[in-house]
Design a protein with these regions (language model features):
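Hot-dog-fold acyl-thioester-processing enzymes
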Residues: 2-62, 118-141
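HotDog/MaoC-like acyl-thioester-processing domains
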Residues: 3, 7, 74-78, 86-141
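Hydrophobic beta-strand-centered segment that forms part of the acyl-chain substrate-binding groove
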Residues: 40-80, 85-92, 108, 114
């Protein structure tokens, strides 16, 4: 198990912003999901959601997203998304996230997905190869 946190860097651009000159609210879940996909890629040999769905016939649709906004996100600094699993259930996984710009906490979040057999869209048990990687990395929020 590694003690180094997984941090995904997001380049926030002018196009991500609304007239208030901060990141458009709808972009923040987008950034979070991008970081979660990057977490999968980092821990599963470059395989993210696309490969899991198409090559492995395993989907992970979201059933819950919760975010608390702490400070505005702007293009001024990179958004650093610390991403980590907080729970692995029988058929679901929950990720936690802390997103910072310039060492200022911008948002926190909790994101739960269920494992599905993609071609029939039915829930399934988390595969053993997923459990083997995820279980040692689970941490509290």
């Amino acid at each position: 198990m590694t003690t180094t946190p997984f941090i995904h860097e997001i380049r926030v651009t002018w196009g991500d912003c609304d007239p208030a000159q901060i990141a458009y609210t709808a972009r923040l879940p987008w950034f979070a999901l991008d970081a979660i996909n990057a977490w999968w890629e980092e821990h599963f040999d470059g395989e993210g959601w696309f490969q899991m769905e198409i090559d492995r016939n395993m989907g992970t649709p979201f059933v819950n997203l919760s975010m608390d906004f702490r400070s505005p996100v702007t293009p001024r600094h990179r958004l650093m998304c610390e991403t980590y699993p907080t729970r692995l259930g029988e058929k679901s996984i929950t990720f936690g996230m802390k997103a910072y710009q310039n060492q200022v906490l911008c948002f926190t979040g909790s994101f739960t997905c269920v494992f599905t057999q993609a071609d029939v869209f039915e829930s399934m048990r988390a595969p053993d190869h997923i459990r083997d990687v995820v279980e040692p990395l689970i941490r509290s929020e």
